[in-house]
Amino acid sequence: MPGKELSDPCVDCRDAEAILTLRRRRLCKDCYIKFVSYKVFKRMENYRLNRGFAKDKPCKLLFPLSYGLSSSVLLHMLHDQLEVQRSKVHGSPGFDLHVLIIEPSTISPSNPAHDEGFELAQKCFPLCSFTKVPFHSIFALVPDIKETMSQFAGKGFEDDPSLSDAERLNAFRSCIATSTSKADVDHILMNRLIVAFAKQMDCQAIIWGDSDSRLAAKTLANVAKGRGSSVIWQVSDGMSPFGLEFNFPLRDLFTAELRDYASFFPELTKLIVPDEPLPANTLTKNLSIDELMMRYVLTQGEKYPGVMLNVTRTANKLDVSQMPANLSHCTFCAAPLMNEVGGGHTQFCYACARSRPSTSS
């Protein structure tokens, strides 16, 4: 008996109706998931096969989860890989994944605590281990950060040891003047917290959940802010200045493609906290450079996805080995100091100097 004729067959399997267009190809649900997941599968190959790591034990990886679309989708894909890895009796040790969550409400009071998301993640991804920490735990994880903050803020900030860690962190953050500087400083502090936690857990690498769209925006924003030298490790796979590998498995996938993937899984819909859309009438001067670049990439990326993909691919070709040896590094962000002149007891890179309260504008 002949099978039912399909009006719009999937171009890959030819056995099911196509429901989505992926890069000009009409695919069914299963083939769409397979295509998107394979992009991440290939990017995780070195960790799955323990290339460059001990062969007798799993490679320990840290994964920061923000409850955003990209990191939530990536966690779902990585857990699928863990399930396959554990099902193989004689396979390589592969990797273990520890998930770190910085409590959203401690980053901004406008962010929901999302405690139900933490419980849901533990339930949906049982092969991962989880830790949740507040933003101000940076003081415990990075012991010298208090002195660094005081030097960074200069005379415009006076640390009060009688305050709680949360209050001290908020006091420091509130002395940063502009929206761009605030976003820049917050990103650096969160990055240092995550790196310090990864080292405490004896992890070999950090897996970041940035999509191609996010990496393109990050590249453009970093160059605009004067952080061109840090693009190498902020958007490229490889060794970071912190002695840990950074890896971005979603670099070949667009935000829109991740959104379609998430729509197939109800648990992801419950886990993801959607980004609040910026009002169309928001004044440009009230936006940070990071927000401006993300808005630009999301709007132009829909029209010219290939251009945004080239931005990320070009940045990924930067070779950290071509950097001059024996460079000193910025005390605040760890970027290599090229031509900067240090002052006082420490040195800050050009971009950090611009973000300091005494110089930001």
From Swiss-Prot:
What keywords sit in the KW lines?
Cytoplasm, tRNA processing
Keyword Cytoplasm applies: yes
User: Does the keyword section mention Flavoprotein?
Assistant: no
Q: Which GO terms describe its cellular component?
A: cytosol
Q: Which GO terms describe its molecular function?
A: nucleotidyltransferase activity; sulfurtransferase activity; tRNA binding
Q: In which pathway does it act?
A: tRNA modification; 5-methoxycarbonylmethyl-2-thiouridine-tRNA biosynthesis
InterPro entries attached here?
CTU2, Rossmann-like_a/b/a_fold
Q: Which GO terms describe its biological process?
A: protein urmylation; tRNA thio-modification; tRNA wobble position uridine thiolation; tRNA wobble uridine modification
Pfam families, A to Z: CTU2 (PF10288)
Specify the superkingdom: Eukaryota
Protein's cellular compartments = Cytoplasm
**Which HAMAP family does the protein's record reference?**
CTU2
* PANTHER family attached to this UniProt entry: CYTOPLASMIC TRNA 2-THIOLATION PROTEIN 2 (PTHR20882:SF14)
Functional note: Plays a central role in 2-thiolation of mcm(5)S(2)U at tRNA wobble positions of tRNA(Lys), tRNA(Glu) and tRNA(Gln). May act by forming a heterodimer with ncs6 that ligates sulfur from thiocarboxylated urm1 onto the uridine of tRNAs at wobble position. Prior mcm(5) tRNA modification by the elongator complex is required for 2-thiolation. May also be involved in protein urmylation.
Q: Which family does it belong to?
A: Belongs to the CTU2/NCS2 family.
What is the name attached to this protein's record?
Cytoplasmic tRNA 2-thiolation protein 2
Name its species: Aspergillus oryzae (strain ATCC 42149 / RIB 40) (Yellow koji mold)
Q: What is the lineage of its organism?
A: Eukaryota, Fungi, Dikarya, Ascomycota, Pezizomycotina
Q: State which gene encodes it.
A: ncs2
